[in-house]
Amino acid sequence: ISNFSIPKRKQRIPILLLVIVYYSMTYYVFRHWNNNLFHLFEPFLTFLFGGIVSLVIATIITIKWKISLHALAISGFSGGMLGLLLISGEVYNLQEMMAYNTILLLLMGLVSYSRLVLKTHTYSQVIVGIVLGFSIELSCVLFHISL
């Protein structure tokens, strides 16, 4: 790695693969605990699975093109939280969850804007990161997609 910010696209791939392995091990442990705890972790497992899927797709894209991983991460978190809000609105305080989602959307804008101001990514790289992260996490959480 030539720099802490990893500006070279090909240097990101080993790190992304390491993170995928780490997320997968965490998913395996939580899946085991979930079976023993009456499936209490199910929404969080779908959240974690969405993160794994996002990272795998981002790694494949990174082979040919640089994508904004910061935008992918913050928008994925926003999409997952929106999914949790939509599936469990009766359980949680709706106003509180909307406040959290509003804050996350503002953070998503700030992070994305900062990537553009720092000139570390192009507009299209940031937009692809946002769309990919948000849509995958929202889909996984909303439709209960996991292994």
Residue ranges and their predicted role:
Residues 1, 25-40:
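Transmembrane alpha-helix boundary signature
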Residues 1-19:
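N-terminal transmembrane-helix/juxtamembrane module of multi-pass inner/ER membrane proteins
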Residues 3, 34-36, 93, 101:
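Detector for Asparagine
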Residues 9-12, 31, 115:
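Arginine residue identity/basic-tract feature
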Residues 17-29, 74-80:
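Core segments of transmembrane alpha-helices
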Residues 41-147:
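Membrane-embedded catalytic cores of phosphoryl/pyrophosphoryl-handling enzymes
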